[in-house]
Amino acid sequence: MLTEKEAEQKLRELAEEFRSLMKQHQYVKAKQRYETARSVAVTMELSEDIREELFGVRGGKGEILRKGAFPEELVQRAFYEASVRKT
């Protein structure tokens, strides 16, 4: 079983894979990387600092205060392309 630090590193690697897959227009695979990272972060109850590093920070009105390793605009595009366009 992975330690918390090892899991954090794996999640950072998933973020790198996500960005690489987006550049290659592999939207379904990119979406899967994001969903896996999100599920693991929630299941492991990672610290808020790590979740913010990975997924960013939003303000009270929904504005993006800090971008994460999974940039929201790319996540939205991956979901759109994978779900609507089914590429």
Feature locations, PLM:
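Short, charge-rich amphipathic alpha-helical segments embedded
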Residues: 33-57
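Short acidic DE-rich linear segments
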Residues: 85-87
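TPR-adjacent "capping" and linker segments in tetratricopeptide-repeat scaffold/adaptor proteins
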Residues: 1-10
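Alpha-helical linker/edge segments of TPR/alpha-solenoid repeat scaffolds
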Residues: 46, 56-79
